Amino acid sequence: MADATPGAEYWTALGWQPSTEQVDQLATLQTLLREWNEKVNLTRLVEGDDYWINQVFDSLWPLAHELKTPHQPRTCIDVGTGGGFPGLAIAIALPGSHMTLLDSVGRKTAAVEAMASRLGLADRVAVRTERIETTGHDRACRGQFDLAMARAVAAAPVVAEYLVPLLKPKGEALLFRGQWSEEDTTEFSSVISPLKAQLTGVQTCQLPAKRGIRHLLRVQPIGSCPSSYPRAVGIPSRTPLGS
């Protein structure tokens, strides 16, 4: 028996009405995640609301603007994709996008690559197995993305250093956060200035079923990111900007 998929209230709260095919893909992704989780420790958020709210909803709610133009061509990268979120959910929701999934753990990238293939996304989902500090200096990636995103990876200044070098001049970095305050905004806006970037917006969402408050930071370039960023492997996390 197939797992139940969310009802109309869920999609209304998300502000997105997926096609039947997209709902089927998201349901299939749950099944694939469950299968791969038996081989590789990808995530504990696989069943019921853990999957549909904490994985799918939490991946898509910040993209209300982008979901209005799903077929618009976009180059996207999900840094530290882990079990494939938010990247695979966004690739399903934005069929015009080309998504790169990045993780330094080969077992995880092998799993998400296999899942993308089973979902019929292989033609527009690429997978890279390497540290983001290396990716940020690769000509194939540096300055090449419309959207660069990271969810549950590291402190915000660290994530900004990972993402900003990947952006096109008019691209955006999407930093998925849990708790966030006005004090955080003030401090973060200051520490990212060496990246030649600015915080352009903070979005807030109360997840359904009282699953907690989430925030999204949108960061855009205001100039060319200096070639010294990201710093060498391990340094951004050991010595975050502003520390």
Swiss-Prot record:
Q: Which InterPro entries match?
A: rRNA_ssu_MeTfrase_G, SAM-dependent_MTases_sf
Q: What is its main location?
A: cytoplasm
Keyword Glycoprotein listed: no
Q: Where in the cell is it found?
A: Cytoplasm
Recite the UniProt keywords alphabetically: Cytoplasm, Methyltransferase, rRNA processing, S-adenosyl-L-methionine, Transferase
Q: Which Pfam families match?
A: GidB
Where does the chain bind S-adenosyl-L-methionine?
Answer: 80, 85, 132-133, 151
Q: Does the keyword Transferase apply?
A: yes
- Per its record, what are the GO molecular function terms? rRNA (guanine-N7-)-methyltransferase activity
Enzyme class, spelled out? transferase
Q: Which SUPFAM superfamilies match?
A: S-adenosyl-L-methionine-dependent methyltransferases
Which Enzyme Commission numbers does its entry carry?
A: 2.1.1.-
> What's in the GO CC field?
cytosol
Physiological role: Specifically methylates the N7 position of a guanine in 16S rRNA.
Matching NCBIfam families, A to Z?
Answer: rsmG_gidB
Tell me its family: Belongs to the methyltransferase superfamily. RNA methyltransferase RsmG family.
Task: Please identify the protein, giving its name as recorded.
Answer: Ribosomal RNA small subunit methyltransferase G
Taxonomy of origin reads: Bacteria, Bacillati, Cyanobacteriota, Cyanophyceae, Synechococcales
